[in-house]
């Protein structure tokens, strides 16, 4: 009965294993992995109303919470520690970095001592892939675009493994994040020494947003996982962007000319995608033909509103939102209204595509290469 009650809402909760009975000699004080955890997220970012309801619940439970922010921030240039220019951008173009924000007061729970101190000191901690891509070392500066287009130089305080940073490209404290225009919270993290049903009941009672899903999320791999931005850049190339109207952007001409191509595909006809899309896309479409499933790909929908290469941000975000994988030409929307039968989804999965139908914010028309 309780499970049915909890699964009637739409926030995602994951509870880490209870470690309270582990050998005390292995316990490290003030490290988040030593606590039971609930993570709360929504499609896009947390509504302000949901944020306030989480805070009310946490206050009633007398427990701990922090909010994680995220946005894509423009990178205008980088400089070495001696102020010599390292990387520059084209006129009116910027690179984009996926930046995470965290409260200074809790940073020790999530990062090693040196990284935590760098974040408190208004420096940026960056991932190894990002440091390699932009030739950055500790003491160098990234010149990011903040509010009112102000260029804000931020010193690199530490370089850490991408997995340790959560596959973001950089992390800064909340105060610095506000200067960069990062106000959205994408996740709340609640932690305590022992989390039980009372926590979930309290959250259920207080969170009024109807489109919320409360689930116990086990440590199982989602077969529709997607590549983080750092790995997308590593595999398919990095490009500068120029803003256009609304969510649309212009990608760097040199990258576009090298990577975006037109080619005739089975079933779909002429398609415009990244050059590395051809083999897996053609393989999936040929298998659909071989199994006699081509009638389930609705070509009228594909021709009217589907597509592959479409340089834009993700629609649900305003400026600062993630760059869509369509901007790399590694995602394709075919049936924009009708959906797909399970076997078609399986075929695309087998050829290396994630399907958007099982995401927190379902995108049932969408297949994305990884």
Feature locations, PLM:
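Hydrophobic membrane-insertion alpha-helices, especially the h-region
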Residues: 1-16
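Membrane-interface junction motifs in transport/secretion proteins
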Residues: 13-52
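Extracellular/periplasmic catalytic domains that process cell-envelope and extracellular macromolecules
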Residues: 31-32, 117-118, 181-182, 322-328
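Basic-flanked hydrophobic alpha-helices used for secretion and membrane insertion
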Residues: 35, 50-51, 55-57, 73-217
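Second-shell loop/turn segments in exported
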Residues: 37-44, 120-121, 264-275, 333-339
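Active-site acidic/histidine clusters and adjacent loop/turn architecture
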Residues: 232-300
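Active-site-adjacent loop/helix surface patches within enzyme catalytic domains
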Residues: 287-327
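Catalytic cores and adjacent binding grooves of peptidoglycan-active enzymes
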Residues: 309, 316-370
């Amino acid at each position: 009965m309780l499970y049915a009650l909890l699964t009637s809402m739409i926030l995602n909760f994951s509870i880490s294993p209870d470690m309270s009975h582990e050998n005390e000699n292995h316990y490290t004080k003030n490290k988040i992995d030593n606590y039971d955890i609930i993570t709360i997220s929504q499609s896009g970012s947390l509504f302000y109303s949901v944020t306030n309801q989480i805070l009310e619940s946490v206050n009633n439970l007398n427990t701990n919470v922090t909010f994680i922010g995220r946005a894509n921030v423009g990178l205008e240039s980088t400089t070495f520690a001696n102020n010599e220019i390292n990387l520059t951008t084209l006129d009116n173009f910027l690179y984009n970095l996926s930046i995470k924000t965290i409260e200074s007061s809790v940073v020790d729970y999530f990062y090693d001592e040196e990284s935590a101190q760098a974040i408190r000191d208004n420096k940026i901690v960056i991932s190894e892939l990002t440091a390699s891509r932009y030739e950055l070392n500790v003491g160098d500066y990234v010149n990011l675009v903040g509010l009112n287009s102000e260029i804000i130089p931020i010193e690199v305080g530490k370089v850490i493994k991408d997995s340790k940073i959560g596959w973001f490209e950089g992390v800064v404290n909340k105060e610095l994040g506000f200067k960069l225009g990062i106000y959205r919270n994408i996740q709340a993290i609640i932690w305590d020494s022992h989390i039980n049903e009372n926590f979930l009941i309290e959250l259920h009672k207080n969170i009024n947003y109807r489109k919320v899903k409360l689930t116990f999320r086990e440590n199982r791999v989602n077969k529709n996982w997607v590549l983080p931005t750092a790995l997308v850049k590593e595999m398919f190339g990095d490009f500068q962007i120029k803003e256009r109207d609304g969510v649309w952007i212009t990608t760097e001409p040199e990258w576009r000319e090298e990577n975006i191509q037109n080619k005739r595909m089975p079933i779909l006809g002429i398609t415009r995608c990244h050059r590395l899309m051809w083999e897996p896309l053609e393989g999936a479409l040929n298998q659909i033909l071989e199994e006699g499933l081509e009638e389930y790909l609705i070509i009228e929908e594909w021709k009217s509103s589907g597509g592959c290469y479409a340089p834009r941000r993700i629609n649900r975000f305003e400026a600062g939102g993630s760059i869509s994988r369509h901007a790399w030409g590694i995602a394709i929307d075919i049936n924009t209204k009708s959906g797909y039968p399970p076997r078609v989804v399986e075929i695309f999965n087998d050829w290396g595509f994630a399907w958007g139908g099982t995401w927190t914010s379902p995108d049932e028309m969408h297949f994305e290469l990884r």
